[in-house]
Design a protein with these regions (language model features):
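Short gly/ser-rich anion-binding loops that grip negatively charged ligand groups
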Residues: 40-43, 69-77, 92-96
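Alpha-helix capping and helix-loop boundary segments enriched in small/acidic/polar residues
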Residues: 41, 119-123, 142, 260
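Well-ordered mid-protein domain cores that form the structural environment of catalytic cofactors
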Residues: 78-118, 123-124, 130
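Short, charged beta->alpha transition segments
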Residues: 18, 50-53, 100-105, 126-128, ...
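Glycine-rich, positively charged N-terminal anion/phosphate-binding segment
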Residues: 39-58
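Surface-exposed amphipathic alpha-helical tracts and adjacent flexible/coil segments at the periphery
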Residues: 1-12, 17-23, 28-35, 60-70, ...
Length: 339
C-alpha cells in the first residue's frame, strides 16, 4: 500500500536545537521569538537571530514555523503588528496562532505567512476545524485528547485543502490542551503565556484538614504520590496508523528539551517515515533509540482510548548521556569530535 509522507515538524528552542533538528531530518521546525510564544524558558530567538535562523533552515530545504500562540492581554496587542511584520520580513513560512485577534492581525501584518491554528485552541471536532479554514487557516493542530477514530472523522468532514497536524511524541498535559491555571495559582507563572511551572508534576500527599501532619496511606514512594502525573507520548510504533488516519504533519514536542533530544527523536521518526514511504520493514532500532533520551514512561496518548497515568513518581528516565558531538567529517571519513 502506497502511503503519503507527512511533514515531520521538530522543536527548535534555540540555535543548538535548530541545527540538530535540521541535521537529523526535520522537514520543518517550530520556534519562537522573544514574545508571544508558549515556551518562555526555551531560549528562543531574538529579532536579530530570527532571519539567520530562517536562512539556515531554508538553505537546507527546511521550513520554519513560528509560535505566536499565547493569549495576549489588551495591553500587549499593540505590540503584535510590529512583531508580525518582523516575522513576515524574515521569511517565516507559517505562524502558529491560538488567539482569534492575533490570527486576524497575522493576516494583515504577515500576509506571506501561512496561519496554523495552535493546539491551544483545543480543536476537537470537524465543525471547529472547518470554521478556522473558512477564516483563512491553512492548517489546524488538533487537540492531543483525540482518538484516531476522531481524527479520521475530522479528516473526512473537512476540506481536503485544510492540513491536519497532530503531536506524535513528547510530554502531555494533565489539562485540556494546556488550558490550565494550576501554575498561575501556585506559583504566579501563567501557563497560557508560556511560563508553566508544571505543578502537575509536583509531589503531593493527602491530609485531612483537622488532622495536620497525619497523612493518608496513598504514597507510592517515600516522598508522596503523583496523582496528576501523565506519561509521555510515543507513537513511533504507530506512525503508519497516523498517516492512514489522514494526518498531514507529525509534530514532536520539546522546545524546552535538549539538543540531544531534538536530534535523537527527529532522527528516529525520520527513519520510520522514510521506511514506511519506501515500503520497507521498520527497523526496531528506532524504537530503542527514543528510549535513549530523557523521558517519562511512554504511552500512546489518547489515540487508542484513555491513556494511563503513572503514579509512582515524576522522575525522568535518564539512562543514557551524550558523550560527544561529531562536528565535521572529511572525504576520507575522518571526523572532528567535540567532547
Amino acid at each position: 500500500m502506497e502511503r503519503k509522507k507527512p511533514e515531520l515538524l521538530s522543536p527548535a528552542g534555540d540555535w543548538e536545537k535548530l541545527k540538530m533538528a535540521v541535521a537529523y531530518g526535520a522537514d520543518a521546525v517550530y520556534l519562537a521569538g522573544t514574545a508571544f510564544g508558549m515556551r518562555s524558558f526555551a531560549g528562543n530567538f531574538t529579532d536579530e537571530e530570527l532571519p539567520r535562523a530562517v536562512k539556515h533552515a531554508h538553505d537546507r530545504g527546511v521550513k520554519v514555523h513560528v509560535t505566536v500562540n499565547t493569549m495576549p492581554r489588551s495591553g500587549e496587542v499593540e505590540q503584535l503588528p510590529a512583531h508580525l511584520e518582523r516575522l513576515n520580513d524574515a521569511g517565516v513560512d507559517a505562524l502558529i496562532v491560538a488567539d482569534l485577534g492575533a490570527f486576524t492581525l497575522a493576516g494583515k501584518y504577515a500576509p506571506r505567512c501561512q496561519r496554523h491554528i495552535s493546539t491551544q485552541q483545543s480543536i476537537a471536532n470537524y465543525a471547529s476545524a472547518a470554521a478556522w479554514y473558512d477564516l483563512g487557516a491553512t492548517r489546524v493542530v488538533l487537540a492531543r485528547e483525540l482518538s484516531l477514530d476522531e481524527i479520521r472523522t475530522i479528516r473526512a468532514k473537512t476540506p481536503k485543502e485544510l492540513e491536519i497536524e497532530t503531536f506524535c511524541h513528547g510530554a502531555m498535559c494533565v489539562s485540556y490542551s494546556g488550558r490550565c491555571l494550576l501554575s498561575n495559582y501556585m506559583t504566579g507563572r501563567d501557563a497560557n503565556r508560556g511560563q508553566c511551572a508544571q505543578p502537575c508534576r509536583y509531589q503531593y500527599a493527602l491530609m485531612e484538614e483537622k488532622r495536620p501532619g497525619e497523612y493518608f496511606p496513598v504514597f507510592e514512594d517515600e516522598k508522596g504520590t503523583y496523582i496528576m502525573n501523565s506519561r509521555d507520548m510515543c507513537t513511533i510504533d504507530h506512525v503508519a496508523e497516523l498517516i492512514d488516519a489522514g494526518v498531514d504533519c507529525l509534530k514532536i514536542e520539546g522546545r524546552a528539551k535538549s539538543g540531544y533530544y531534538a536530534a535523537i527523536v527527529t532522527g528516529a521518526y525520520r527513519h520510520v517515515l522514510d521506511d514506511i514511504a519506501a515500503g520497507r520493514p521498520i527497523d526496531p532500532v528506532w524504537r530503542d533509540e527514543v528510549e535513549h533520551v530523557s523521558h517519562r514512561h511512554y504511552s500512546t496518548g489518547f489515540f487508542y482510548g484513555q491513556p494511563g497515568q503513572y503514579y509512582d513518581n515524576a522522575r525522568y528516565i535518564r539512562d543514557w548521556q551524550i558523550c560527544a558531538v561529531v562536528t565535521d567529517c572529511d572525504e576520507n571519513g575522518l571526523a572532528t569530535v567535540s567532547l
